[in-house]
Amino acid sequence: MGAGSSTEQRSPEQPAESDTPSELELSGHGPAAEASGAAGDPADADPATKLPQKNGQLSAVNGVAEQEDVHVQEESQDGQEEEVTVEDVGQRESEDVKEKDRAKEMAASSTVVEDITKDEQEETPEIIEQIPASESNVEEMAQAAESQANDVGFKKVFKFVGFKFTVKKDKNEKSDTVQLLTVKKDEGEGAEASVGAGDHQEPGVETVGESASKESELKQSTEKQEGTLKQAQSSTEIPLQAESGQGTEEEAAKDGEENREKEPTKPLESPTSPVSNETTSSFKKFFTHGWAGWRKKTSFKKPKEDDLETSEKRKEQEAEKVDEEEGEKTEPAPAEEQEPAEGTDQARLSADYEKVELPLEDQVGDLEALSEKCAPLATEVFDEKTEAHQEVVAEVHVSTVEKMTKGQGGAEVEGDVVVEGSGESLPPEKLAETQEVPQEAEPVEELMKTKEVCVSGGDHTQLTDLSPEEKMLPKHPEGIVSEVEMLSSQERIKVQGSPLKKLFSSSGLKKLSGKKQKGKRGGGGGDEEPGEYQHIQTESPESADEQKGESSASSPEEPEEIACLEKGPSEAPQEAEAEEGATSDGEKKREGITPWASFKKMVTPKKRVRRPSESDKEEELDKVKSATLSSTESTASGMQDEVRAVGEEQRSEEPKRRVDTSVSWEALICVGSSKKRARKASSSDDEGGPRTLGGDGHRAEEASKDKEADALPASTQEQDQAHGSSSPEPAGSPSEGEGVSTWESFKRLVTPRKKSKSKLEERAEDSGAEQLASEIEPSREESWVSIKKFIPGRRKKRADGKQEQAAVEDSGPGEINEDDPDVPAVVPLSEYDAVEREKLEAQRAQENVELPQLKGAVYVSEELSKTLVHTVSVAVIDGTRAVTSAEERSPSWISASMTEPLEHAEGVATPPVGEVTEKDITAEATPALAQTLPGGKDAHDDIVTSEVDFTSEAVTAAETTEALRAEELTEASGAEETTDMVSAVSQLSDSPDTTEEATPVQEVEGGMLDTEEQERQTQAVLQAVADKVKEDSQVPATQTLQRAGPKALEKVEEVEEDSEVLATEKEKDVVPEGPVQEAETEHLAQGSETVQATPESLEVPEVTEDVDRATTCQVIKHQQLMEQAVAPESSETLTDSETNGSTPLADSDTPNGTQQDETVDSQDSNAIAAVKQSQVTEEEAAAAQTEGPSTPSSFPAQEEHREKPGRDVLEPTQALAAGAVPILAKAEVGQEGEAGQFDGEKVKDGQCVKELEVPVHTGPNSQKTADLTRDSEVMEVARCQETESNEEQSISPEKREMGTDVEKEETETKTEQASEEHEQETAAPEHEGTHPKPVLTADMPHSERGKALGSLEGSPSLPDQDKADCIEVQVQSSDTPVTQTTEAVKKVEETVATSEMDESLECAGAQSLPAEKLSETGGYGTLQHGEDTVPQGPESQAESIPIIVTPAPESILHSDLQREVSASQKQRSDEDNKPDAGPDAAGKESAAREKILRAEPEILELESKSNKIVQSVIQTAVDQFARTETAPETHASDLQNQVPVMQADSQGAQQMLDKDESDLQVSPQDGTLSAVAQEGLAVSDSSEGMSKASEMITTLAVESASVKESVEKLPLQCKDEKEHAADGPQHQSLAKAEADASGNLTKESPDTNGPKLTEEGDALKEEMNKAQTEEDDLQEPKGDLTES
């Protein structure tokens, strides 16, 4: 007809012309735009600018066509609508444009529908009239309108409707042309009818031109859809159908040019129709008139075609189309022979479906807006012809279907476009059976569109994925006009289309199968008989069944589809009976074969859908929530997705197979396949019966049903619908373990699928689908894995017997792998369980093998591995074992084990892991140390340390690895079993830490006896070691360098001595805690042995230095103690801080994780010691701090922390057991200023424990798991310490004893040194007594203040720094400020300098650790949070209160230097720190340095004094070290160990501070300012600050000035804590220099501490308040900095 021909003519003409005109028209300037000028301009404003343009173009095309050829207008309108959709699709290809196009498409489509409706209404008379005029005008309009229609409208229709045609195109290009014409009939009735008449009648230019234009459109859609092959085929087909090479040439040219031109042209023209139709709401017209317009167009164009012998030819064509459709159905194998092209198409379809899915969802809404966006999309559509064309086809198909449905359904279709449109479209199809070929295609389109609409309402993606191809492919067969060409092409395309149809109509076939088959039968010419339709019904029911399973994923669509299927089948048989009369039985067979082949494809993709079951697994997350519906949906969606992927693969394979096995398929499908299917289904059901747990009967019934279904598609449909209803049951299958009825229902769902799959698979197997079956089976297993995950997990939870049955089922159905697609659906459930079990067992065995390997100690590894093997779930917890054994790998055990590990961790004693680890490690490592200590302490100690560290780390790693591995295994099995498993595993990943933490806690409970024994052994070893350590510590610092390893031994010995003392006092104080403390002591001793190697090197010289300093400082401090009880302690607190810092630095020298662990431990000991000390009277606290400067405890704590790397689980147990580790760390820190901090930490026990968490996170890099463990440990410790804080308040001596050597010493100090504290404060104020008492004096007040500050700052700090560290640090900082205040400000300055270094480190890495925690952690604590809070007692107190604690230390430093300068610089430092908390720590550092320069005179004086004092203190310490070495040696050694570490760490923390120390300790004071600023920097530049601090500390060994650089280096070392081992000597020298600085500060501290102490105490209080305020203000920034 004229429209088609003129459209075609223009299309050829406009290939060159059309670019400009159509583009102009696209812009509204072309002739089409001119034609649409009147209407197009108004339309431009109607839906949207582009929409009006496109609608104007449509209306322009329509207007020209109305003027010239209503047929052309209809085609143009339809094409324009399609083009509008196509253009949108083209833009959709660019996702943003596509989305925009969707909105525009909705507007454009509605407008186009309005235009089409009005145009069709107007064109109804005009079409006939304009048929002659259309040739002339159509030539013009054909260029603009057809280019647009071909590009946009037909592309879209072909992408939706025409895609099927396109698929058929690839089969037969001429048929594609006919199909395109049919599509055009669907889209533009005249086009299809004219092609029908044109191909047969060849109405001159109309048919040729229309067919050529439509063929070009087909070719365009083909090129876009099917690619070069299909293009070539469509080119061949198009000339055949077009009967003119011009059609092909025009198609080729038009494809590139006309499509582009037509798309722009039609958008330009489309505004005309919106003008006409936009009076009515676009959507109303689009849905109401759009569908009616489509049908009207179909009827109009068909009347034209009827005028052009269309009715006869249509009937013939319909019959031929039905035959061709049957041929297509019969030729899914040929179609799959053309699979390569079809595979490409399907690949495109898959990709485009994804793209089209979006359009389908949005098309209804976007159709109106489509025209707006189409214009620019035209080029994109052509550029992305294949994708765009597919998308356009999908979109246009939706639009066309919607329009057709509207035309058919009318207003009712508006309400029920999805259901009524499809349902009503069928009656109109019947009504227009003469026009049913186009109408049929349209109803099919409507059905597809209904599908897509349903898809839009339900699963747009899933159903759209199915429905686009379904729509596209079926529409192509429906649109097939030419008989032979249509038959060949449609057979091919139907092969492709029917697979795609049935693939996508698997869900859509529910709707389309009835309606498409109606269309095929009714629209196909009514030749197809109801029997053929029944085959199709059988095909579609099975497809519907499977896709009910699939669309059960889109269950909302499923009812609609079922309704459509019911409507369609009920109506389709009528049409089929009416129209199928012409269809031959061979066609029925073909259709039967084709439906079965399509169904096979549909079913086969289902098999592969199980591969997308990964997506289903993802969906199974939702499925887990909605197991019944969602699992079915995810399975259906996964199957649909896999139907696409597999459809592509299998289509490539199956087209040939189907071609070869078309008859065999019939036999298989009709006869053998149904019987075989029944047999396979029954056999699989028999075997699957055990699987389905009583599903044998159901499957046997279903097998018989399938047999009957083969004979009776209706019954199959009913069964499929029943399975569709039961398809939710697969979703409910997870709960099917709960009930057999549900499981049976699931079996039913699976069984029909198996039956259909077995049929299809038998066919596929016959056709070589076995390969696909193997692929499909894994995919099924995967898809079913998700279902299995639900089912097996719940099975496991609910019945292991079911799993066993499932295993039996696996063996049975696994044996029946002929139905592998069927079997995998069920088999993978149990098989998966068995496989998972095997995997878990293998993994467990591997863990058993690997864990011992991972574990340094075979003892731990074996026992742990055994325990872990037993409790692969999370950790070696008896409760967890019970949970694991009870629940095994079921998802529930994860939560149960997670819950129980926590519970057990808290309440259950899991001494086996921790104790075994502890015993093995302690007995193994400690005896080795004891044995090897006499020999090469350095080498062996290092070895033992490494062994112990490795063992402890291995234990921790093993435990963590076990927990993680159990998690991983659980995750593996869980991920396989259930998303719940995954979520539980994700929780489990947390639980392992908790479990590890819990394990140590349990260890404490159950391992206390073991701990006592181990502690006794350790004490014996440690005694020897301690003696050697004493000797070594008596050795000069030169030996200390040699004693990098022996230090650890010394520490161990000290720890052992402390452990002995602690054991004695533990026994005295607390028998139950004694074991725990012993266990911790052993851990600490072990940790000391492990960690002490490096600290010892620091320890010996620094101990000497500390003794010297302790002596000097004790003299000074003693005087100061006499003068100021606090001042000595401050200096010693500095020493402790330095000692702690040095030790952690030494520790940090050894391992990063160790330091972190140590930090955690020091934090633990600090928290515990703080609690204990706060519990202890100030004197006790002073004594505990005095003796317990906790140097041993800090070393043990540090050692423990090192040990903790391996013993994170054990450590938590230790920490929980005695809270000793936190107490140790805090006791050590408390040694600095923790007396008050302990008081504050009494309030903060939980916080101190939380600080443990923070320290754990302090070294998150080294030990995240340990950190997590420590976090839970900290939490547990926090809980324990909170409980213990009450206990510790009474037991504080005990717990300090429990803490470690420091705690032991502290306990001794508390008990013995309770009096000794005063003595040592007076007599032994040298290093210990001096520290504690001032610290006690200052700390008790400040501890209260620290409590307030700790609670105040801690709470603010806590948010930033895990709040635990901040609180602890703040508490300590509070205590430390008190100590600082009480201490000589110089000592405070030194402490601040040290603590600033620590703080810098702390800023760098450490969250606001207590000053001593930082000291213990060295830079480590600093590494954690970078909170300036309390690297060292005083400064961290001042600083920790404000996260910019540095200001307070600065004030302290400057209090030493200048209270004015300190106040101003404190504020400056606070300001600097606040900025420094920001990234500019160096700038702040410089500012602090400037402040330091301001104080430089005083700094220089202090520097010289400090240098002199350092030397004198070193000598005095060396002299007094021998004296103090015997009694206070352990304390001194520990103190000095802590001091060196603290010095190293403090110096590391005080990058600037040590630099300032180089200036003097005034510069350290200023350095504190700068260090505080640098702490802020450290926060932002925690790594840099740590490295700088480590570097500076390294240099600090050379010189306090070089300490500046070494502090800078120290942060690096803090970063690389491993480097700290090498830095240990440097730390020793740093400790010496810092001891000198401490001595200087000590000297200074009498001067500064006396006057400035009070002032600074007030100033510190004020500054602490300020700091708290600032810190509260800065906490968030610092927390951010810490995070950053």
Curated annotation (Swiss-Prot):
This is A-kinase anchor protein 12. GO terms for molecular function: adenylate cyclase binding; calmodulin binding; protein kinase A binding; signaling receptor complex adaptor activity. Anchoring protein that mediates the subcellular compartmentation of protein kinase A (PKA) and protein kinase C (PKC). The modification Phosphotyrosine is found at Y353. Disulfide bonds: none annotated. The modification Phosphothreonine is found at T330, T628, T871. It comes from Mus musculus (Mouse). There is a cross-link at K1030 (Glycyl lysine isopeptide (Lys-Gly) (interchain with G-Cter in SUMO1)). Residues 75-86, 321-342 have a biased composition (Acidic residues). A motif (AKAP CaM-binding 1) lies at residues 593-613. Residues 1501-1514 are annotated as: RII-binding. GO terms for biological process: adenylate cyclase-inhibiting G protein-coupled receptor signaling pathway; cellular response to interleukin-1; cellular response to tumor necrosis factor; hepatic stellate cell activation; modulation of chemical synaptic transmission; negative regulation of vascular permeability; positive regulation of ERK1 and ERK2 cascade; positive regulation of hepatic stellate cell migration. A motif (AKAP CaM-binding 2) lies at residues 740-760. Keywords: Calmodulin-binding, Cytoplasm, Cytoskeleton, Isopeptide bond, Lipoprotein, Membrane, Myristate, Phosphoprotein, Repeat, Ubl conjugation. Residues 89-105, 212-227, 251-266, 302-320, 468-478, 611-625, 641-660, 696-710, 1198-1210, 1239-1254, 1293-1331, 1467-1492, 1653-1684 have a biased composition (Basic and acidic residues). Residues 512-521 have a biased composition (Basic residues). Pfam families: RII_binding_1 (PF10522), WSK (PF03832). Residues 228-247, 270-281, 714-723, 980-992, 1130-1176 have a biased composition (Polar residues). It comes from the Eukaryota. A motif (AKAP CaM-binding 3) lies at residues 781-801. A lipid is attached at G2 (N-myristoyl glycine). Its main location: cytoplasm. Residues 1-124, 175-281, 296-353, 421-479, 492-825, 970-1001, 1055-1106, 1121-1211, 1232-1365, 1391-1492, 1568-1684 are annotated as: Disordered.
